[in-house]
């Protein structure tokens, strides 16, 4: 996977989106396919006392969940082979002179990535460790399960952010020296937030449908964390969009510092408030962490690479989306006979508001 990331980056810089998407989709399909084969077909068949030449040849009950890792390995090998032509094209002798500037640029991003992973996962680790002595193992694991299940609903925005970053980052670098690039970055941010805020509103208006992605109904008690986590991920998306300033100016050490700053916020808030508030503390800690990183990055960016972001429009779209969702709660629309249809009116209101707000950008 690490080696494959290099030709994947090359495909992004060459704007070969179809090849990039095709390789990654093939990787996912192979991974899912082998998991279904091993765990969805072979495992139940063998456990029921059956079997055939496929299970006799390719399946060993003793391996168990190890087949998840085997499926991952197979998918990664296939991805590597698919990318081999891109990797070998134009291959030259190593240019050692590039090594030092590459390391100076990338090592801080490595630490930023590690701190980002800590931000992403540390709350769940802390939930288990801090609640276990207070609530006991079963209750602590229940809270962890509730939080983990409801957290998945916020991944809708996370996936959109990831897709955006795949396309946007090479574009930002390619446009850096062009006249009006900063104004273009600002416009992209505005439309980016428009989509994320609309997604937030859509998910929350139809949370009674999205909740069925959580198969255990006992976990629905934690749905109240979903709007908090969705908003947190909007702030994270804005932060990622802003990160263009320290990447283009080669001040990637600031990226590491911002990520470590966020990780410390996550650590402290979770340690202090989880014992009293449980998984709600983790949700709010995530929101505060990403909001703090976003604000600090904005002010640092103004100093080193000022981009004229349209703060009024960005704030208005986020605020209106949150306000419309709040209105549905106050009016208790989810309990009305035609609640799902009424929610369309609120989505339409957001669309109309955004349309008028974004008109000047189209001139």
Can you describe what each PLM-predicted range is?
Residues 20, 24, 68-72, 101, ...:
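Residue-level signature of transmembrane alpha-helical cores of multipass secondary-active transporters
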Residues 61-65, 101-105, 109, 127-155, ...:
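Interfacial/gating helices of multi-pass transporter permease domains
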Residues 21-88, 261-266, 279-300, 342-350:
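Hydrophobic alpha-helical transmembrane segments
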Residues 1-24, 87, 230-261, 303:
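Membrane-interface junctions at transmembrane-helix termini in multi-pass inner-membrane proteins
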Residues 19, 96-108, 285-347:
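Membrane-interface "helix-start" segments
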Residues 146-260:
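Specific pore-lining/lateral-gate transmembrane helices of multi-pass inner-membrane transport
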Residues 45-71, 78-120, 167, 171-183, ...:
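Interhelical loop/hinge segments that connect adjacent transmembrane helices in multipass membrane
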Residues 53, 57-65, 116, 262-265, ...:
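Transmembrane alpha-helical segments of multi-pass transport proteins
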